[in-house]
Amino acid sequence: MTPIFTNIILAFATAFLGTLIFRSHLMSSLLCLEGMMLSLFILSTLIILNMHLTVSFMMPILLLVFAACEAAIGLALLVMVSNTYGLDYIKNLNLLQC
């Protein structure tokens, strides 16, 4: 495995670990999810280019589109929660609270 692939997998693992550690704040979770999506995009692009997979050239672009949609929905949720509660804690999103 080349050092580039190792660094990208390490970036994904770090972002995933950050999602697990900072799961109480919505903004931190969104940033870690974006880091995961960026590392997946770069990894899939490098794999497709190295293996000359001409059939799946559009897969990284599709992944990037889904990442943009996820970011837009996440930011809309962040704005809604911060306007409603004044905080970005995920525990405020519990539907079982009265």
Swiss-Prot record:
Single GO molecular function: NADH dehydrogenase (ubiquinone) activity
Keywords of this entry: Electron transport, Membrane, Mitochondrion, Mitochondrion inner membrane, NAD, Respiratory chain, Translocase, Transmembrane, Transmembrane helix, Transport, Ubiquinone
Plastid recorded as keyword: no
Coarse class of the protein's main subcellular location: mitochondrion
EC number annotated for this UniProt entry: 7.1.1.2
The keyword Acetylation is assigned to this record: no
Topology with respect to the bilayer: Multi-pass membrane protein
Regions that span the bilayer: 2-22, 29-49, 61-81
Gene Ontology, cellular component aspect: mitochondrial inner membrane; respiratory chain complex I
InterPro entries, alphabetized: NADH_UbQ_OxRdtase_chain4L/K, NUOK/Mnh_C1-like
Location relative to the cell: Mitochondrion inner membrane
Family: Belongs to the complex I subunit 4L family.
Subunit structure: Core subunit of respiratory chain NADH dehydrogenase (Complex I) which is composed of 45 different subunits.
Protein name per UniProt: NADH-ubiquinone oxidoreductase chain 4L
Organism: Avahi cleesei (Cleese's woolly lemur)
